[in-house]
Amino acid sequence: MKYISFLLSLCLCASVFAQNPQTYFTKEEMTNLVNCLPAPPDSGSLEFANDILRYMWGKTMRQDAERAAEIEHDAIWNLDTLAVIFSVPFGLEISQEKTPEIYKAFTQGVGTIELIRIIPKAYYNRKRPYVMYNEHMLTTWEEDELRNEGSYPSGHTIRGWAAALVLAEINPAATTELFARAGRYGENRVITGAHWQSDVDASRPAASIGYVQLQSSPAYREQMERARAEFVYLVYGTVPDKKYKAIVKNLAR
């Protein structure tokens, strides 16, 4: 419970409302996943049978009080909350105040990648597990908002995987911890009843596709270099390139 309490205390410093960050591409410019990922499994398939088994498994996992608290926290659709969550495996606080360049790369990078979910969600309009079974989610406060939104792919899973991809680019030494947390972040959506396992499984390559596309943005590449320079200065006390000395001066104020 200490871990959850730590996260919740950090969240008090986060903004209450989800941000709408500037993005490097529009949703129309993002790769259309309908053209490059499989459709959700048919209801008579072995894959869907596995989805049902995983949904039943997820309901048993809700009995774990610490995991349930983490799931409640992970469900909050807010980039500041996501930054709080991933600050732990990243190893530094990710915030506009303490790490402005990392924060900007993180929120705008993840905010761009997650746009890739919009078209396939509307196209497939897959029914969510809690809707299909007419049962409650663990995170009951989400139910009305999610009821008419497509289940495939999982927006939360895309966000979590995108967070790990962007932050591992800044701090490669934290790769294992970042992707372990991202994996659990997606799995938590199965446990709460928001998504089928196949939604979550498709969302990880979906995020990777968005991340590859993100690399083609010169503005993102420049912001990533600034974020790396800030990270190196904060961790090692050096500036990798003199053109980024202004970052150090701003941090020293």
What are these regions (language model features)?
Residues 203, 227:
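Acidic/histidine-rich, metal-coordinating catalytic segments
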Residues 195-202:
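Short acidic/histidine-rich active-site segments
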Residues 20-192, 213-219, 223, 229, ...:
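Hydrophobic alpha-helical bundle signature of multipass membrane enzymes
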